[in-house]
Every structure is written in structure tokens, then in C-alpha cells.
Curated annotation (Swiss-Prot):
Belongs to the gamma-glutamyl phosphate reductase family. It comes from Clostridium novyi (strain NT). GO terms for cellular component: cytoplasm. SUPFAM superfamilies: ALDH-like. This is Gamma-glutamyl phosphate reductase. Keywords: Amino-acid biosynthesis, Cytoplasm, NADP, Oxidoreductase, Proline biosynthesis. It comes from the Bacteria. It is found in: Cytoplasm. It is an enzyme of class 1 (oxidoreductase).
């Protein structure tokens, strides 16, 4: 079977399953999610063996340590994935929720209720945990899902997807509710992007290249998830220790994720104290700093930041640093270079915090907290399908409700117009 026919056959199966998924009971969905969790734990060794192949291939291809970290599945991460499934099972089912209801003067009763989107296509890169997170949220929100992971994780994804799909079907979900495109070629993605008759929405998760390619070439509607050029602005009134802790966490806890800090802005009135203090704390972590002239004069070993650096998502132990003269300059810089993902101000000035919240255009805007909290589980949504940086149909961490649409139901007594 050629690639086009294979993808269309998979999409057709998903479309058939989506019709049935829309009316699957909450109990059945929860049973399926718990069965999927059990199956992951029971098959831990098989998953780790498959992942070892991907890790070996990744090292041979020269993947960075941060990307290899995203690819890794070990016993602890598999347990975390299983717990994520159970957490989603414990969340309230959004399907059938009455959003609003009212009565018209002609006595028509009109209600708006939450319904699934239908078939969701997820295109993602070297993070096999996305296979589980995406499947969990799609199942709970009554959608069928077509997963297409990156070639780097093909062995891990194939093993995990087969395990959870079989468990879900045995627990009562329709066949085709969870699907993985096992062909890692780009041709498969190109076919997916054109399947308007089968796929209701595409959600790309990955780097700028992947996301831009899907947005540019897809005819299926796309929810654009975030490339994260996230900034931390350390205001003149900031507490030095708090600011340093936030920067270190935002940059180094997991540098290869989209909510990690990539650019640091420091008010000139605090720069001569803060930047050397921060640099000393960063030394054991081997973080590379690229900076403006003033940053270079204050931080030993800092190299020159180019125009490209201000817009770069490093996904590594690197960041760009600029000393700014004012809050206005910080806001202008963020406006110019932000990808509208997550932006942070560290300040003890209430007026400045409120200006920052009001004027920064991003999915998540923080006062005195790390950008690393832009995450579905941290927001209390359970797992997330991605972090949307657009304004239609959803924005920010996308949990269950963001994977639904609505329809109107109308009760009449024979009314005609």
C-alpha cells in the first residue's frame, strides 16, 4: 500500500470512530484511560527496549543532550505517563456540558452544549510522552486522534501507541479511536495536511520549522502551538535572589521545552548588581550567555548577541541578555521579538507589574514566577495537547475544553417562522 492510501485508510478509520466516540459514556472513557495506564506499567520493559533503539539512533545522528533528554523514556517517566492518564480520568468530562440556556419570547428554549471536535491530527517531534498525553485528552474529550510523531521516536511511539490503543479498545472504545501513522516520512505528513474530509483540526507540536511548515501548507484547519521565545524582565525594584531563582529555573530546569526562558532583559539600575550575581550562580550549570555591550561588560565570558539571537529559541543551555533603560524599552523589545508564548516580569513595583500584564501580548503573562508554569498540569487542566500561541480557537495550554466545540439545541412546541 502506498503512503497516501495508508494515511487515508487510517484517517477513514478515525472518522468512523469519531462518530462513535461522541456518544461514549464518561464511565467507559475513564475505564479506558485507566486500562491504558495499567497497560503502560505492565509493558514498561518493552517500552524501554524500544526507546533504547531511538536513543542509540539519536546519538548516532548527533542529537544534542537536551533533545536526547526529551526523547528518553525510563521507568520514572513511564510511571509519570501512566499517572497522567489516571489524572485525566479523574477530570470532569466536558462533553454534554450546558454552556448556557435561555428562553425566547416565542417560547423556544435554546441551549448551547459542549461537543467533541471530531478527528484531531497531532504532528509532533521527538517527545514520545506526547503520544500518551495527546491520546488521553482526545479520549476524554470524545475525539478520535491520529498521531504522527517524529522519526527520532518512531520505535518508542509505535510501541506505546499499540499498547494504549489495544488497551482502549478492550475497555470499550471503538476501533480507530487512537491511531498512529507508523510511516515516519514527510510524505505522510503532507497527506495528513490535506485531508479536510477526514480530519477536523491539526495541532503541530515542535520547533519553528515544523509548525511553520504545517501552518503554511495545511488545508485542514490548524491550531498553532508555540515556539517559545520567552522573556524574563528583571525590573529595577526586583528582589535579586527571587529574580535569580526565577531565571535559573526558567532556563535550566528543562531548557529544551517551549516555556523555557530564551531572553533576559535587565533594567539598567539593577544590572551592575544583578548580572554578576546571576552569572556566579549560573557557573556550575555551564550556561552560555550572549549579550549586549553592557551585558558583556558585566558578565565575564559573555559573547556578543546578534540580531538573530534576540529572536532565537535556543532550546539549550544558552540565552540572550540585554540591559534596558526602562520598562518602556523592555516592552518594546518583547513586542518586537516575542512569539507570544510566555513572558515574565520580576518586580516589586505594583504599577509596573500592572502595565506589564496589560501591555504584553502573550498567551501567559507572569508577575514574579517562572515561565515554566505554562503547562496544562500546572494550570490544573491535567495533561495538555499543546500550548496555543494564536487567538483562535484556543490560547495558552490546551486542556479538555479546548478540544471541544459547541452546538445549539433548540426545544420547540411547533413554532414556525
Amino acid at each position: 500500500m502506498n503512503i497516501e492510501n495508508y494515511v487515508i485508510e487510517t484517517a477513514s478509520l478515525a472518522k468512523s470512530a469519531a462518530r462513535k466516540m461522541s456518544i461514549v459514556s464518561t464511565v467507559t472513557k475513564n475505564n479506558a484511560l485507566n486500562a491504558m495506564a495499567d497497560a503502560l506499567i505492565e509493558n514498561t520493559n518493552a517500552i524501554i527496549e524500544a526507546n533504547k533503539k531511538d536513543m542509540e539512533n539519536g546519538r548516532e545522528k548527533g542529537l544534542t543532550e537536551s533533545l536526547l533528554d526529551r526523547l528518553l523514556l525510563d521507568e520514572a517517566r513511564i510511571k509519570s505517563m501512566a499517572q497522567g492518564l489516571r489524572d485525566v480520568a479523574s477530570l470532569e468530562d466536558p462533553i454534554g456540558e450546558v454552556i448556557r440556556m435561555w428562553r425566547r419570547p416565542n417560547n423556544l428554549k435554546i441551549g448551547q452544549i459542549r461537543v467533541p471536535l471530531g478527528v484531531i491530527g497531532i504532528i509532533y517531534e521527538a517527545r514520545p510522552n506526547v503520544t500518551v498525553d495527546a491520546a488521553a485528552l482526545c479520549v476524554k474529550s470524545g475525539n478520535a486522534v491520529i498521531l504522527r510523531g517524529g522519526s527520532e521516536a518512531i520505535n518508542s511511539n509505535t510501541t506505546v501507541a499499540r499498547i494504549i490503543s489495544e488497551a482502549a479498545t478492550k475497555a470499550g472504545l471503538p476501533e480507530g479511536a487512537i491511531n498512529l501513522i507508523e510511516n515516519p516520512s514527510r510524505d505522510a505528513v503532507n497527506v495528513m495536511m490535506k485531508l479536510n474530509d477526514y480530519i477536523d483540526v491539526l495541532i503541530p507540536r515542535g520547533g519553528a520549522g515544523l509548525i511553520n511548515a504545517v501552518v503554511k501548507n495545511a488545508t485542514v484547519p490548524v491550531i498553532q502551538t508555540g515556539v517559545g521565545n520567552c522573556h524574563v524582565f528583571v525590573d529595577a525594584s526586583a528582589d535579586l535572589e527571587m529574580a535569580a531563582n526565577i531565571v535559573i529555573n526558567a532556563k535550566t530546569q528543562r531548557p529544551a521545552v517551549c516555556n523555557a526562558m530564551e531572553s533576559l532583559l535587565v533594567h539598567k539600575d539593577i544590572a551592575d548588581k544583578f548580572l554578576p550575581y546571576l552569572a556566579e550562580k549560573l557557573k556550575p550549570l555551564n550556561v552560555e550567555i550572549k549579550g549586549c555591550i553592557r551585558t558583556q561588560s558585566l558578565v565575564e565570558g559573555a559573547t556578543e548577541a546578534t540580531e538573530e539571537d534576540w529572536a532565537k529559541e535556543y532550546l539549550d543551555f544558552k540565552f540572550a541578555s540585554k540591559v534596558v533603560d526602562s520598562l518602556d524599552e523592555a516592552l518594546d523589545h518583547i513586542y518586537k521579538y516575542s512569539t507570544k508564548h510566555s513572558e515574565v516580569i520580576v518586580t516589586n513595583n505594583y504599577e509596573n507589574s500592572q502595565r506589564f500584564l496589560a501591555e504584553v501580548d502573550a498567551a501567559a503573562v507572569y508577575v514574579n514566577a517562572s515561565s515554566r508554569f505554562t503547562d496544562g498540569s500546572e494550570f490544573g487542566f491535567g495533561a495538555e495537547i499543546g500550548i496555543s500561541t494564536q487567538k483562535l480557537h484556543a490560547r495558552g495550554p490546551m486542556g479538555l475544553k479546548e478540544l471541544t466545540s459547541s452546538k445549539y439545541i433548540i426545544y420547540g412546541e411547533g413554532q414556525i417562522r
